Amino acid sequence: MKPNFSLRLRIFNLNCWGIPYLSKHRADRMRRLGDFLNQESFDLALLEEVWSEQDFQYLRQKLSPTYPAAHHFRSGIIGSGLCVFSKHPIQELTQHIYTLNGYPYMIHHGDWFSGKAVGLLVLHLSGMVLNAYVTHLHAEYNRQKDIYLAHRVAQAWELAQFIHHTSKKADVVLLCGDLNMHPEDLGCCLLKEWTGLHDAYLETRDFKGSEEGNTMVPKNCYVSQQELKPFPFGVRIDYVLYKAVSGFYISCKSFETTTGFDPHRGTPLSDHEALMATLFVRHSPPQQNPSSTHGPAERSPLMCVLKEAWTELGLGMAQARWWATFASYVIGLGLLLLALLCVLAAGGGAGEAAILLWTPSVGLVLWAGAFYLFHVQEVNGLYRAQAELQHVLGRAREAQDLGPEPQPALLLGQQEGDRTKEQ
């Protein structure tokens, strides 16, 4: 690779709002999305909420002349909704399904059935290795009473760990998707602090689009105005994040969002705004790479966010244990009721009533049993994430005890050291 190596990457990301039978004008929006992607010819198009296999196959066929490589990440009952279209050959593919993803009995929210995940594709571009990730985290629904906060923090940590452990051979790391978190939210801070990823909106030299880079805006006719009432300018929950590793430098030359309507058609492509980033990658001495520098000033916010995440997971675990305990009491009461019904039926005094109550009592016990098992699984999932955070915090304390010099390699899993050894 030449010392003056330089590469331009054009990236597109959109939550397509492609729920079959529920999303308005879905077929028309998919058609216009395909036309737009063919016209712009991005290097990578990473999409969320393409729930329908028919929609994916339609886009795949329509985009094949411009984007010969495509993949649909399937998981859960109705699918993850994640798919990618690439102008360049995809060398490797994998995906990771999040351990925690809401509650199956919250059917009206539906996140549990989708199998939320993160997809990874590896590209080799002019001798450079690019790891591109696409993801969609659990929705918030109610910011004041967010019952999914612990799950979203656990997902953010799981995502950060997945990126950390799969990107050690990468030169450039790219993450796009609907994180369902505001920039200042705990999960978003945890993800960026632990991985060292940079926010394209904050880093760009040239921004065009909606105010404050928001990706759900009041101007969009598909967005619930009631949900955005506390946020008059909208919210920013979709991101393009990136970093360079091992002697490379990456910068965002331009970043653009759609603005809630299509000037040619009037209706937007989705209820979310599309993100378009132009990134430049070039050679740079390792010490000049901002993503590989972790001095004492950067460790303090990282430690704070790790501790805060540990606490939030603990609160979620306590809540999950409470529900599991409640379910166990219901199981006990249900079994006692069944025993009583058996006695009544055997005695013949109230046999008909006992028979009538038998089926709902069995249903109650089965429902409570499923409820108990699910929340026990939730406790274990939260405990696993909290234990990993506890280990990281313990390593950080060990690093601090080694002396006044910063020990970022210990805290960050010696990622840069491993990379240097491999080279």
From Swiss-Prot:
EC number, UniProt record: 3.1.4.12
Alphabetic keyword roster: Cell membrane, Hydrolase, Lipid metabolism, Magnesium, Membrane, Metal-binding, Sphingolipid metabolism, Transmembrane, Transmembrane helix
Site (Important for substrate recognition): 180
Active site residues per record: 272 (proton acceptor)
Region of interest (Disordered), ranges: 400-423
Organism domain of life: Eukaryota
Necessary cofactors: Mg(2+)
Record GO cellular component, one term: caveola
A biological process term (GO) from this entry: intracellular signal transduction
Enzyme class at the top of the EC tree: hydrolase
Keyword Hydrolase: yes
Gene3D superfamilies: Endonuclease/exonuclease/phosphatase
Keyword Membrane: yes
TM stretches of this protein: 330-350, 354-374
Compartments, record wording: Cell membrane
Membrane topology: Multi-pass membrane protein
Catalytic activity entry: a sphingomyelin + H2O = phosphocholine + an N-acylsphing-4-enine + H(+); an N-(acyl)-sphingosylphosphocholine + H2O = an N-acyl-sphingoid base + phosphocholine + H(+); 1-O-octadecyl-sn-glycero-3-phosphocholine + H2O = 1-O-octadecyl-sn-glycerol + phosphocholine + H(+); 1-O-hexadecyl-sn-glycero-3-phosphocholine + H2O = 1-O-hexadecyl-sn-glycerol + phosphocholine + H(+)
GO molecular-function terms, A-Z: metal ion binding; phosphoric diester hydrolase activity; sphingomyelin phosphodiesterase activity
Entry function: Catalyzes, at least in vitro, the hydrolysis of sphingomyelin to form ceramide and phosphocholine. Also hydrolyzes 1-O-alkyl-2-lyso-sn-glycero-3-phosphocholine (lyso-platelet-activating factor) in vivo. Also acts on 1-acyl-2-lyso-sn-glycero-3-phosphocholine (lyso-PC) and sphingosylphosphocholine.
Entry similarity comment: Belongs to the neutral sphingomyelinase family.
Protein name: Sphingomyelin phosphodiesterase 2
Organism (species): Homo sapiens
Highest classification ranks of the organism: Eukaryota, Metazoa, Chordata, Craniata, Vertebrata
Gene: SMPD2
